[in-house]
């Protein structure tokens, strides 16, 4: 198997996976951040459309406040406050003023060899440099 197949097999609890198969893989880390139209909408839709009000495994979820820093408008600060409040309610770590999340996530140890990482930002693929599938 390729490295990607090995990571996805482990994340799906299977001995092996092959190209073209449908699998259900559990990410090691889900990364999100304070970007209007994404994080705020995600939180709202998860609750309203799917009845999900609690992160299943807070140890696998991380939030970064790394956009619009410092907040230049009240609406930006409101988004930051809502992101902090949601993170506290969920019991997930919220990192801010440390740098860009998809870079800092590696520095903080969220990216490691063999990890399966999910994020809605395409830049997360750079975590492949650490041996992760992102």
Protein language model features and the residues they cover:
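Fe-S-dependent hydro-lyases/dehydratases of central metabolism
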Residues: 1-134
């Amino acid at each position: 198997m390729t490295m990607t197949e090995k990571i996805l097999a482990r994340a799906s609890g299977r001995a092996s996976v092959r190209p073209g198969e449908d699998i259900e893989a559990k990410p090691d880390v889900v990364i999100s951040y304070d970007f209007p139209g994404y994080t705020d909408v995600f939180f709202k839709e998860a609750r309203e459309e799917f009845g999900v009000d609690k992160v299943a495994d807070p140890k696998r979820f991380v939030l970064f406040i790394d956009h619009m820093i410092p907040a230049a408008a009240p609406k930006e600060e409101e988004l930051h406050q809502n992101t902090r409040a949601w993170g506290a309610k969920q019991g997930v770590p919220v990192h801010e003023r440390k740098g860009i999340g998809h870079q800092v996530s590696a520095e903080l140890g969220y990216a490691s060899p063999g990890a399966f990482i999910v994020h809605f930002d395409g830049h997360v693929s750079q975590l492949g440099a650490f041996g992760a599938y992102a």
